[in-house]
């Protein structure tokens, strides 16, 4: 059966969660479904979603600053009422309240996805986001499922773990990293270690930087690359300079050629110590 699915995402950043929402949107469209996407206005997700050219795709950017916004609620409710939706799929807290309540009032089934392994506040009324409102709760891994199942009044039979997928059309073992190594001026046989991901607290970039001098003691010619942007970018950039390792570390910022970058690495590091669901870079 072909469905009309409404994705909602209030996050304003660009990381694994937002990438997954966009990937699912594209793949659902490939399978013939109708997809509407309500996303944070002026966000990276909106910018990238605008590149989707498909008559079955509908983009609705809205400024979703608060779950208590009556204007946003009414906008969503009117959209749902005028369109024959089969599912509302929510992702972040703000849009889960707005989309979830709209779904309940309009009789459209709600799916809530929990992407991160951070603790869930199960005090009233927050636990309603996982108990009363959704028909199903999807998580990005078993660890997150176990966290959600501990929330008050949650039916564990409604919690399903679905890890992030990999598009093997893009990530192919035959992809060459030569172009990237040339760009970074990496010599033949020179060791390249990289970390790919949004730069924020729990991603462990500080640990990655602390490990670099230790590695250089053993492999003096090793080079390092940090790929990604985020709220901690300037801080990490300053720490690289302070440590005097600018000639050994390249900060590339956001890149879209991740398959080629991964192919160029000898070692890829995941230094996260919290928050992960299914790290897509792995």
PLM segments and residue spans:
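Membrane-interface segments of envelope glycosyltransferases acting on lipid-linked substrates or membrane lipids
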Residues: 1-282
């Amino acid at each position: 059966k072909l469905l009309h699915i409404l994705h909602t995402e209030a996050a304003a950043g660009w990381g694994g969660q937002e990438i997954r929402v966009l990937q699912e949107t594209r793949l659902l469209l490939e399978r013939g479904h109708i997809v509407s996407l309500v996303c944070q206005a002026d966000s990276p997700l909106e910018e990238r979603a605008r590149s989707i050219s498909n008559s079955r795709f509908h983009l609705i950017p809205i400024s979703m600053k608060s779950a208590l916004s009556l204007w946003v609620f009414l906008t969503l409710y009117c959209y749902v009422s005028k369109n024959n939706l089969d599912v509302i799929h929510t992702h972040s807290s703000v849009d889960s309240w707005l989309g979830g309540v709209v779904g309940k009032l309009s009789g459209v089934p709600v799916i809530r996805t929990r992407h991160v392994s951070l603790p869930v506040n199960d005090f009233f009324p927050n636990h309603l986001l996982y108990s009363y409102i959704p028909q199903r709760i999807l998580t990005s891994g078993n660890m997150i499922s176990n966290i959600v199942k501990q929330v008050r009044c949650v039916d564990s039979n409604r919690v399903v773990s679905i890890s992030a997928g990999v598009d093997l059309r893009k990530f192919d073992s035959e992809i060459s990293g030569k172009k990237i190594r040339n760009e970074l001026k990496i010599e033949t046989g020179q060791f390249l270690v990289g970390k790919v991901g949004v730069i924020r607290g729990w991603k462990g970039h500080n640990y990655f930087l602390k490990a670099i001098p230790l590695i250089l003691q053993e492999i003096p010619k090793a080079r390092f690359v940090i790929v990604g942007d985020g709220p901690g970018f300037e801080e990490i950039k300053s720490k690289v300079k302070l440590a005097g390792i600018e000639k050994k570390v390249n900060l590339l910022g956001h890149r879209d050629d991740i398959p080629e970058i991964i192919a160029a690495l000898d070692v890829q590091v995941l230094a996260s110590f919290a928050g992960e669901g299914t790290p897509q870079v792995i």
